[in-house]
UniProtKB/Swiss-Prot annotation:
Transmembrane residue ranges: 165-185, 217-237, 366-386
Protein's name according to its UniProt entry: Putative type II secretion system protein F
Binding-site residues for Ca(2+), renumbered to this chain: 90, 144, 148
Example GO BP: protein secretion by the type II secretion system
UniProt keyword Transmembrane helix present: yes
Gene designation per UniProt: gspF
Lineage: Bacteria, Pseudomonadati, Pseudomonadota, Gammaproteobacteria, Enterobacterales
Length: 398
């Protein structure tokens, strides 16, 4: 959630800006850590002008980051770099955004402050890394790391989507074929069986019952599914229900461990990027939670950051969240002892992502043939149920 704040620096200079945080308490805490004296803070109201998200894809944002890193490494002034990238961009909205950022820089604002006007495009992680690069004088290397980080996330997401396309299409086709057979084909073939004086086989009676039920209650079922889906969506938007739902997902077999594995790898990778860019550990732990989608996991990791603030070790604090597997915790503990925390966190994230990709591939390799076999058995049942009374009728005629 975005919060608009007014604060005063230790030098007495007043400033205002926007900060992303889970809640107001975390926003106040992070501003205090930056050495700011908070004057006012409130949730940012949704406004059609200021908070409208520009339609810019993740790949375009990554390309912009990579180009800016290259031009910065070539010692080209920042405002000139933004002008060049904006002119070459095929996305008019991105060009408009870069022009506004460039105007803010020409007015004397640093890049990190200029990006605050577009919080939905440049999130707090992006802005914090840019700010760290500006302070350290290593903006180009930090932007390279940020581009690599975004590319890695895109690759993982693309692989997951690509691996799910075929099973989803196969499932949709299978369900569609069964519905067409039961509602259109089977009734026409089996309507002649109704007048048979002899009792129909059990499988045929079951098939006729399913077909009749689906034809009578089909529209009602569709309406019920739609109403339930809309009701569930409205329920998620009320109060703390989304948090409760996310906590419930973590207790579901297979789904819970998968969510924990994906989020734990993303968290450690984000934290390693922040730490290697000069962001303080506690700030990095709080910022890393914002890259996660599950609210329950975000809350647990926020509690872990608070434990570290109180003097506990990182690996013990992370262990209490019940999110990280033993191997990841072991590598974090080794990194704490050896002083190579960032390096070992990256390795732990790499190992976890590779393991999860292998598990997903194995699961899908089992699911696809299982679905085909199930579909074949359903079609076989329909064929047998139709043929049995036909053969029975043929024997009666003979």
């Amino acid at each position: 959630m975005n919060y608009r704040y007014r604060a005063m620096t230790q030098d007495g200079q007043k400033l205002q800006g926007i900060i992303d945080a889970n809640d107001e308490r975390q926003a106040r805490l992070r501003l205090r850590e930056e050495g700011l004296f908070l004057l006012d803070i409130r949730p940012q109201k949704s406004s059609g002008v200021k908070t409208r998200r520009p339609r810019i894809s993740h790949s375009e944002l990554t390309l912009f980051t990579r180009q800016l890193a290259t031009l910065s490494a070539a010692a080209l002034p920042l405002e000139e770099s933004l002008a060049v990238i904006g002119q070459q961009s095929s996305n008019k909205r991105l060009g408009d955004v870069l022009n506004q950022v460039r105007s803010a820089i020409l007015e004397g604002h640093p890049l990190s402050d200029a990006l605050q006007h577009f919080p939905t495009l440049f999130d707090s992680l992006y802005r914090t890394l840019v700010k760290a690069g500006e302070k350290s004088g290593l903006l180009a290397p930090v932007l390279e790391k940020l581009a690599d980080y975004n590319e890695n996330r895109q690759k993982i997401r693309s692989k997951l989507i690509q691996s799910l396309i075929y099973p989803c299409m196969l499932t949709t086709v299978a369900i569609g074929v069964v519905i067409i057979l039961l509602t259109a084909v089977v009734p026409k073939i089996t309507e002649q069986f109704v007048h048979m004086k002899q009792q129909l086989p059990l499988s045929t009676r079951i098939l006729l019952g399913l077909s009749d039920t689906l034809q009578r209650t089909g529209p009602t079922l569709l309406a019920t599914v739609f109403i339930v889906a809309v009701g569930f969506w409205l329920w998620l938007k009320r109060g703390n229900n989304r948090h409760r739902f996310h906590a419930m997902l973590l207790r579901v077999a297979l789904i819970g461990p998968l969510i924990c594995a994906i989020n734990s790898a993303r968290y450690l990778r984000t934290l390693s990027i922040l730490q290697s860019s000069g962001v303080p550990l506690l700030d990095g732990m709080n910022l890393s939670t914002e890259s996660l989608n599950n609210l329950e996991i975000r809350q647990r990791l926020a509690n872990a950051a608070e434990n570290v603030r109180q003097g506990n070790s990182i690996h013990l604090s992370l262990e209490q969240t019940a999110i990280f597997p033993p191997m990841m915790l072991y590598m974090v503990a080794s990194g704490e002892k050896s002083g190579q925390l960032g390096t070992l966190m990256v390795r732990a994230a790499d190992n976890q992502e590779t393991l999860q990709q292998n598990r997903i591939a194995l699961t899908l390799s089992i699911f696809e043939p299982a679905l085909i076999i199930t579909m074949a058995l359903i079609v076989l049942f329909i064929v047998v149920s139709v043929l049995q009374p036909l053969l029975q009728l043929n024997s009666m005629i003979n």
